[in-house]
């Protein structure tokens, strides 16, 4: 089974706040992002990470579409409730940045209509 985690405490400082996909059956981990020491998509054995504490990150994995052999995975590291709370209480989330059509933008700089649209598009249950 594959699960997503964010490392919150580790003996290795390069792991702090990094995001990983763990495959416990294969004993492997894939780096999604880290401040340093690990490259994006780098695969390592789980025991190479050493001692760490983490929090689970919900994975939203939809069936991928193959186009000329390519695949796409969209990993959302926010919950719907977080964005809805940011709409109601923008002062609590001044640094909340999202990605829209390849551009990074502060969520609070969007109009209320755009914010609702982002929430609706990001957290669909079915097509």
Swiss-Prot record:
Residues carrying Glycine radical: 102
Gene3D superfamilies per UniProt: 3.20.70.20
Residue intervals of the Glycine radical domain: 5-127
InterPro entries for this protein: Auton_GlycylRad_Cofactor (IPR050244), Form_AcTrfase_GR_CS (IPR019777), Gly_radical (IPR001150), Glycyl_radical_cofactor_GrcA (IPR011140)
Disulphide bridges, residue numbers: none
Keywords, alphabetical: Organic radical
GO cellular component: cytosol
Keyword set includes Transport: no
The organism's place on the tree of life at top rank: Bacteria
Keyword Chloroplast set for record: no
One of the record's GO molecular function terms: formate C-acetyltransferase activity
Function according to Swiss-Prot or TrEMBL: Acts as a radical domain for damaged PFL and possibly other radical proteins.
HAMAP family reported in the protein's UniProt record: GrcA
Protein name in UniProt: Autonomous glycyl radical cofactor
Gene that this sequence comes from: grcA
């Amino acid at each position: 089974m594959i699960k997503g985690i964010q490392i919150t405490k580790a003996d290795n400082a390069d792991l702090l706040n990094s995001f990983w996909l763990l495959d416990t059956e294969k004993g492997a981990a894939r780096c999604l992002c880290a401040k340093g020491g690990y490259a994006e998509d780098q695969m390592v054995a789980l025991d190479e990470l050493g001692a760490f504490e983490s929090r689970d990150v919900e994975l939203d994995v939809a069936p991928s579409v193959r186009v000329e052999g390519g695949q796409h995975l969209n990993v959302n590291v926010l919950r719907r409730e977080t964005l809805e709370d940011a709409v109601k209480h923008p002062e609590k989330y001044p640094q909340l940045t999202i990605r829209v059509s390849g551009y990074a933008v502060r969520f609070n700089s969007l109009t209320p209509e755009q914010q609702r649209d982002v929430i609706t598009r990001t957290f669909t249950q079915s097509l």
